[in-house]
A protein has these predicted regions:
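Core structural elements
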Residues: 143, 207-212
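Short, well-structured active-site flanking segments
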Residues: 26, 151-161, 226
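Conserved, well-structured interaction surfaces
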Residues: 35, 39-62, 80-154, 164-200
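C-terminal motif of bacterial Sec signal peptides marking the signal peptidase cleavage site
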Residues: 17-20
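Active-site-proximal beta-strand/loop segments in catalytic clefts of secreted hydrolases
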Residues: 122, 162, 314-316
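Hydrophobic helical h-region of N-terminal Sec-dependent signal peptides
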Residues: 10-14
Length: 343
């Protein structure tokens, strides 16, 4: 009996000790919107995730804005095999199926959400001012670039600039393009005057893209007005655009940004010989072809040099296969290149 009472007393003591403990429920492993980004490394990882969306779209290039724009233009012709209905329909500005570009829509909004998340949290990270401005500028550029492609392809797409938006509203054309232009202007203003060469965008990339977006919105897109109701006499391109922050962007300001890019960026056109832009003039093969041998040609990217004409390029490698890593190789080249050696 005494033994039983003694054991019960021990058990009661143990249970009392357990109930008096405080359970630490904080998750030290999983990253979420509540704890990420919190460090400089987190910010770098988050920015890499936004860039990764460029490769994600490359996994299914036939769904992308670039693919449709190329086939709809005079730059190339729709080809492929007899069963490539998707590509043939794009070439004729037709639908092959209802969700033919759905993957592009999903991918680009995923990239936008990643940009929103980083921009929402970057103020909570202790960063040097120049580093913070560079990261914030790159995130704003990429968000603007993704919206630019979506708006160019679909028109008035839902607009969200915060990761907390659950049901974003459909903006007017002026609101949507105002946000695109504001992001690009902000990126050009805050990023340091340092040219990037590692696949990242810089101040001058933002200035150039600002000019491109301005020309499309006030030119080809006719300020977002009803194209059917416009004529050459009734259409008047905008000379200023109201931005969401209450400021105004003028045509003269855009010209100033472009002039800064041309005069101060270090980017330039290759004027020596057009063929120097193409890889067949590299020092290992330039003498292999009758049309290049003995002509003093030199590829602009020989010896790891950077093409002076390239302001912004998606980074690819040669390691991708047909699995989930396919987007890390230039899958556009697979579609636009020579189909086979047999003719």
């Amino acid at each position: 009996m005494k033994k039983t009472i003694y054991l019960i007393g021990i058990a009661a003591s143990i249970m009392g000790g357990i109930t008096s403990c405080t359970l630490d429920a904080e998750d030290y492993v999983t990253k979420s919107s509540e704890n990420f980004p919190a460090t400089t490394e987190d910010a770098t990882q988050a920015l890499a995730g936004i860039y990764q969306n460029l490769n994600q779209v490359s996994a299914t290039p036939e769904c992308s804005f670039l693919y449709a724009a190329m086939l709809a233009s005079d730059d190339c012709l729709g080809g492929g095999g007899p069963n490539d209905l998707h590509m043939q329909s794009l070439d004729m500005l037709m639908n092959s199926k209802q969700d033919m570009t759905q993957q592009f829509w999903k991918d680009r909004y995923q990239g936008i959400n990643r940009a929103n998340s980083l921009l929402d949290g970057i103020g909570n990270i202790e960063l040097a001012e120049s580093d913070k401005n560079q990261i914030e500028g790159e995130a704003k550029f990429l968000r603007a670039f993704y919206y630019y492609e979506l708006a160019s392809m679909y028109g008035r797409v839902p607009l969200t600039i915060t990761s907390q938006s659950v049901e974003p509203s459909q903006p007017t054309a002026a609101e949507l393009w105002g946000q695109i232009l504001q992001d690009l202007r902000d990126a050009a203003e805050i990023m340091p005057n340092t040219r990037k060469t590692d696949g990242h965008v810089d101040k001058y990339t933002a200035e150039a893209m600002l000019g491109r977006a301005w020309l499309f919105y006030t030119g080809m897109y006719c300020n977002g007005e009803d194209l059917a109701a416009l004529t050459s006499t009734t259409y008047s391109p905008l000379t200023s655009v109201a931005l969401p922050d209450g400021s105004t962007l003028t045509k003269d300001q855009v010209i100033g940004y472009i002039d800064d890019c041309v005069n101060n960026s270090g980017y330039s056109l290759v004027t020596s010989d057009f063929r120097n832009l193409w890889a067949y003039t590299n020092r290992f093969t330039v003498e292999d072809y009758d049309y290049t041998t003995g002509q003093g040609l030199k590829w602009v990217e020989d010896d790891n040099a950077v093409n002076p004409e390239t302001l912004f390029a998606i980074k690819y490698n040669k390691l991708a296969d047909w699995s989930t890593s396919i987007g890390y190789a230039n899958n556009f080249a697979l579609h636009f290149g020579v189909r086979g050696m047999a003719g």
